[in-house]
Amino acid sequence: MSAKEVKFGVDARDRMLRGVDILANAVKVTLGPKGRNVVLDKSFGAPRITKDGVTVAKEIELEDKFENMGAQMVREVASKSADLAGDGTTTATVLAAAIVREGAKSVAAGMNPMDLKRGIDLAVEAVVADLVKNSKKVTSNDEIAQVGTISANGDAEIGKFLADAMKKVGNEGVITVEEAKSLETELDVVEGMQFDRGYISPYFVTNADKMRVEFDDAYILINEKKLSNLNELLPLLEAVVQTGKPLVIVAEDVEGEALATLVVNRLRGGLKVAAVKAPGFGDRRKAMLQDIAILTGGQAISEDLGIKMENVTLQMLGRAKKVMIDKENTTIVNGAGKKVDIEARVAQIKAQIEETTSDYDREKLQERLAKLAGGVAVIRVGGATEIEVKERKDRVDDAMHATRAAVEEGIVPGGGVALLRASEQLKRIKTANDDQKTGVEIVRKALSAPARQIAINAGEDGSVIVGKVLEKDQYNYGFDSQTGEYGDMVKKGIIDPTKVVRAAIQNAASVAALLITTEAMIAELPKKGGAGAGGMPPGGGMGGMDF
């Protein structure tokens, strides 16, 4: 085991604070509508330009191990805020740095760090309660657009695209962001349920121009196993022919004489039919087939349930107003499933999302949820160069998460105003002793940091702006750094999602309180005598890799 270096007390906290400040200073320049860009060097390809706080934070690694520990702890604040609310990462970082800075001064002055932490916790509880109390539900499409615009750094086009997407797919629908191949940003909405499997044979095509199958008012057979034996299909096919309606078969595969017969019947015009392979694999396939069954009001035919193919009746088939199948995708629109059943399935998937620990599983479950609940909207972000597209895509991602958060928990005035107003409430908090009171005071001072930083980035005097905003007793009154005017922030469309602001202060205080209560730090001693690789003579070509 290699030797370790140990730092104590003031020395440890000073080193840590230096790391916190370096990270916070790099991140805070991006805050607000007049925040600046940060350029990140990439080991391959062009540098990346971004205004996204968490992206900047993730790039920072410091040489000094103790400084780096401080920086990494605050980086955790940004990451946690990004995970929880998807935005507010810069605000969280600025708050954390402010709390740590004030807290370190108090500890140096001889106050009890544990009491300071208790005071900080009390203050955060009061701030969250105040945010929730003053939160306003998002009602109109315009408000969603405003949230998106603010989060995308004042880009109204992005706000409008997101509002349109949410209007079309609903709050539960999935919105994905991709890079476009053109200059224009565009919105593409897939209504109904779509899965990535196309027709098994091109002979099923009904629209030769578009090379796709289009059926109206179709029956849907959902089968888990392969279909190769014609005899077991015959009774069902005859029943469907009697109704004169088209049939879509979703199965693991359709092959052999079953496929040949379906194709021949289709070509002769006796039977409107198409077959597609079931989506997904293994257990996920079972779940997706069950989703399709619930959406269309049918039954997933499975031998586990003891249902044999030859015993399937028309009542077991799903129904849909429209089914479209092309070479790669199948879309089912307006399935005949009961609303109650669909809602129960949605609730079940939501519960699984809460419980899962795997990001991949969560993503797949969210896709399934969207397909059942609303649909999928794709925003394709355009731009003149690859660097511009990437930078814009970052902002669209942030804005998308912010609009989601706004719909979930409502909105508060933006520009750091909600936190400023909450800071006034902290003057009334009763504490057990003076050290706890100082903890509350630390948070009260820190709450003005985001508003101050937004003003500084806009070239204004932060302290003057904060003072003027606090003079007025109106909750929504604040400073619009884009125009340089004071006024009602909500009316001006400068709003933040409550969830984003709440997550920012909770995460910032949580990590900052841990840093303040740190008394010792341990890190590996730097290796002496360069980075020669073990067992290799100096200059052996591999040593420090200095080519």
UniProtKB/Swiss-Prot annotation:
Positions contributing to ATP binding: 30-33, 51, 87-91, 415, 496
Record-given protein name: Chaperonin GroEL 2
Any Pfam family the entry gives: Cpn60_TCP1
Enzyme Commission number, as recorded: 5.6.1.7
InterPro entries: Chaperonin_Cpn60_CS, Cpn60/GroEL, Cpn60/GroEL/TCP-1, GroEL-like_apical_dom_sf, GROEL-like_equatorial_sf, TCP-1-like_intermed_sf
Reactions it catalyzes: ATP + H2O + a folded polypeptide = ADP + phosphate + an unfolded polypeptide
Protein source organism: Rhodopseudomonas palustris (strain HaA2)
GO cellular component: cytoplasm
Cross-referenced HAMAP family: CH60 (MF_00600)
Stated role: Together with its co-chaperonin GroES, plays an essential role in assisting protein folding. The GroEL-GroES system forms a nano-cage that allows encapsulation of the non-native substrate proteins and provides a physical environment optimized to promote and accelerate protein folding.
Entry's family note: Belongs to the chaperonin (HSP60) family.
Subunit structure: Forms a cylinder of 14 subunits composed of two heptameric rings stacked back-to-back. Interacts with the co-chaperonin GroES.
A single GO molecular function term of this UniProt record: ATP binding
Cystine connections: none
Keyword terms: ATP-binding, Chaperone, Cytoplasm, Isomerase, Nucleotide-binding
UniProt keyword annotation of Cytoplasm present: yes
Any GO BP: protein refolding
Compartmental location: Cytoplasm
